[in-house]
Amino acid sequence: MGTKSGKKIIKQGLFKSKGYRQFNQYKEEYETKFPEFAKRFTNQLLEQIKADSSPNVTQQKFGEEVGSTDIILESSQIDPIKSKLENVDVLNDRVLRILNSNFVKMTFPVFNALFDASTEYFHDNKDPKLREDIVDGHIIAIDLSEPMDRIVDKDEDLDYLDDYKLMNPYILKLARDKIAKGGEEVLKQFENGFKDARVGQYLDTKLKQNSTAITEKELDESYKKYRSVMGTAGSNMALSRQPLGEVFRIGMGKASESVGCGNEIEDSIRDKAVKIPSWPLYYSLSTNDVRKGFELTMERSEMYLNDARKALERLPENFSHRAFLEFLFLTVEHYSEFWYKRLQKENIWSDLTSKLPK
């Protein structure tokens, strides 16, 4: 952990700080229970796929809702793919592929912690099934962005994109069914967040087509794909109740935008090309300097994280999981710092510059 934040994490680990202990507790729970979640996800998805007697209608409705026919199957493709995915082993493979995501790995322990903190603050009766449904539902909703991104980007899992197209409507329905267990307001907040995220996703796709004319405002709008989903999920871990709901919304939304910057740096290293669209691309083109572009991206990542940390100042006195959130934001800081440091070490500036869109 050769970053400033990494050294702070190590120090907290050595001294077993409260934040470290809480974070470790939820990380261990994630590692233990994740296989159960993946199995549950697969089986419930399988039930929906098998029970659907009108998969073509399901595809069309999903395409209308998300505003794109590019992410649904042609009617002639549906039956053979549906038949293939009705094999539990095949479906489980696809589920595990889309769950192999940094966002999922980072959010699972966080949502459980936020739900527990809310339960304690509001003196709710402990309800393990409600906790499972609310956390599962939002993880599944967030995970929907993985296959949708892969379908649009066509940069990984090329052999499975049609399978993902069939799965997407059922993933969304499963998420909705679980989130609805939290009540009308919780579902309403999710729907609003999902709608905003679709706006961000649409802009993301649009900006790919004219990448040299990206504006700061457009790129900020496209980041709704991060902040709307994560912010809404944060708020809903408190069942959309104040004051925690608003603090969780801002904190999780801004932290996810910070992670988004780190992810763009990571992807640029992997592809040896600046991600399109992204903050590194916007800044590289506007300054005519790729190094400066990534430097400014790090500054933006820090700005997002500072906003997330400011939200913690609004937490109630004696809030049980304050130290957890402070430690969490330290890990977010380390993520971006780690990939920025790796970028400097890789020294691929000439590749990045030569592949900039003209």
Segments the model singles out, each with a brief description of its role:
Residues 1-358:
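All-alpha prenyltransferase/terpene-synthase fold signal
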